Amino acid sequence: MAVVRLPDGSERVYEHSVTVGEVAASIGAGLARAALAGKVNGKLVDLSARIENDSDVAIITEKDAEGLEIIRHSSAHLLAHAVKELFPEAQVTIGPVIEDGFYYDFSYKRPFTPEDLAAIEKRMAEISTRNLKVERQVWDRSEAINFFKNQGEHYKAQIIEAIPGDEDVSLYSQGNFTDLCRGPHVPATSRLKVFKLMKLAGAYWRGDSHNEMLQRIYGTAWTNKDDQNAYLRRLEEAEKRDHRKLGKQLGLFHLQEEAPGMVFWHPKGWVVWQQVEQYMRDIFRNNGYLEIRTPSVLDKGLWERSGHWENFRENMFVTQAEDREFSVKPMNCPGHVQVFKQGLKSYRDLPLRLAEFGSCHRNEPSGALHGIMRVRAFTQDDAHIFCTESQVQDEAVQFIDLLQKVYNDFGFNDILVKLSTRPAKRVGSEEQWDKAEEALRSALNHKNLIWELQPGEGAFYGPKIEFSLKDSIGRIWQCGTLQLDFSMPERLGAEFVAEDNSRQIPVMLHRAILGSLERFIGILIENHAGALPLWLSPDHAVVLNISEGQADYAREVTEELRRAGIRAYADLRNEKITYKIREHSLQKLPYQIIVGDKEVAAQRVAVRTRSGSDLGQMTLPALVDRLKEEIRTRAGAA
């Protein structure tokens, strides 16, 4: 007999063991038709999973987030099935769910083409209409390895060989296609109706450039056409906002092959950079941070003591000089500990907040680079707070206040928060972890924030809070971090004199608000579609004369604006005014100041915003006041 407890608190008693699908059918025919999978005692399982004992059971449908994930995972297998039917010699490797979709990696003798992609998608639709039953079986490990080797699927055999001995080897079959997977999957291929293949890319097997380059096919899958169409519209909008395209169009920066993952900032782009950096410098200065500067190249020995050499070596740029091995720093924390160690510190000196616009380099795989969003050379608004355990909560609260102010000033008001707690492998005592997690949890609750718990997702050296922004088209960008560290201060010999004269090790809080300045500027460009708020714009205004007769007055107006601290320039070219207006509108310039004979006679200017709004004539002092107020309040784009 099995007692099944449902999410609404009701119970159902079954005389014999029962499958999840049978539970759904006993509740109602409608639920049985809608069911995709189940959750038994918190674990996702197939509808065919058998319930032998008393259990908590939930039926998963497409209305559940897990339901959509199962649809996407099953769609990845549908993709692999279609590829094997069309290209029997292709080898399948892995096909996970990703944000908004899935991908599958294949090994094949020639590159897939866009025409292949269309044919594969068509075959996926055909397989869906066959309504093939999807069945799970647990296989003997050696039999599964031999099965895939006999099929010529050597990558699958490798994957099985790497599965821990205490885990089941589960295979899923639909028609004549069998794949390795933990599951769960939809019960039949007919449940997969809304999908689209998106693009092709390359990917190394196991992410190692020494291995074969595989072909990755990306796809998306949804529960209904409306959701898919909305997603495709978002993609179109994101394409228009692509910071790489806008960076070139607006003359902000460029990248080139001779310096992969490293940005060439142009004058206009560097103005934006300086505005962001100076804003953050003021934030540091006004909130008790001491700005420092540490070396970019440090001896291998320091990286060995910090643990980076063992855990991060493959991402570090290494060089040699005078028989010594050095690394360009991938992060700033070891250098900050060295500054803390200079001179004996007392508990009265804590908390000590050290900040740096730290220039870091990481040897990211070339395939992972993406404009200025994912680079090899970047600058962080980095800071480390050295404090006692009892100070952690107050420091966390102050940091959250600061982070919210910064994000609001940059126009981001929708912030997602996640707290990651102790992983299985960790340093520090249970008491330390209890105190640290409670301090961060209390700080979040003190600020009345809605936050998500991520059990076991903390770093081995301490729990952390992650802060993500939602942009104007609904995309999520993880930027801010507050990371507690029990390990590095001890590894690098940091200590302070406590009130009882004992030597103690400080807690170290790694914290960043923007993260990488390059990436954050990329986010700003895409969030505003290139039309940055006035205070961040490379130029605030351009002065346009209608004809040669107003050139001198246009120069005077430009000089007055510059003297008032407005970033302005004059366009005195002998072109039609409509041509000049259009050209500067495409450059997303916030204000166009137009002067003709009427404006010269009245000693006024005609003002137009980049959105096309005509503000009419106004005096120059009135215009200056308007611009200064907009800059002061960091108002949105004109």
UniProtKB/Swiss-Prot annotation:
Catalytic activity, EC: 6.1.1.3
Domain of life, source organism: Bacteria
One Pfam short name: tRNA_SAD
Assigned keywords, A-Z: Aminoacyl-tRNA synthetase, ATP-binding, Cytoplasm, Ligase, Metal-binding, Nucleotide-binding, Protein biosynthesis, RNA-binding, tRNA-binding, Zinc
TGS domain ranges (all copies): 1-61
Transmembrane segments: none
GO molecular function annotations of the record: ATP binding; metal ion binding; threonine-tRNA ligase activity; tRNA binding
UniProt cofactor(s): Zn(2+)
Gene Ontology CC entries for this record: cytosol
SUPFAM superfamilies: Class II aaRS ABD-related, Class II aaRS and biotin synthetases, TGS-like, ThrRS/AlaRS common domain
Binding residues annotated for Zn(2+), in chain numbering: C333, H384, H510
Bound cofactor: record note: Binds 1 zinc ion per subunit.
InterPro entries: aa-tRNA-synt_IIb, aa-tRNA-synth_II, aa-tRNA-synth_II/BPL/LPL, Anticodon-bd, Anticodon-bd_dom_sf, Beta-grasp_dom_sf, TGS, TGS-like
GO BP annotations listed: threonyl-tRNA aminoacylation
Catalytic activity: tRNA(Thr) + L-threonine + ATP = L-threonyl-tRNA(Thr) + AMP + diphosphate + H(+)
UniProt subcellular location: Cytoplasm
The protein's assembly and partners: Homodimer.
General function of this protein: Catalyzes the attachment of threonine to tRNA(Thr) in a two-step reaction: L-threonine is first activated by ATP to form Thr-AMP and then transferred to the acceptor end of tRNA(Thr). Also edits incorrectly charged L-seryl-tRNA(Thr).
Family (UniProt): Belongs to the class-II aminoacyl-tRNA synthetase family.
Protein name, per record: Threonine--tRNA ligase
Lineage of the organism: Bacteria, Pseudomonadati, Pseudomonadota, Betaproteobacteria, Nitrosomonadales
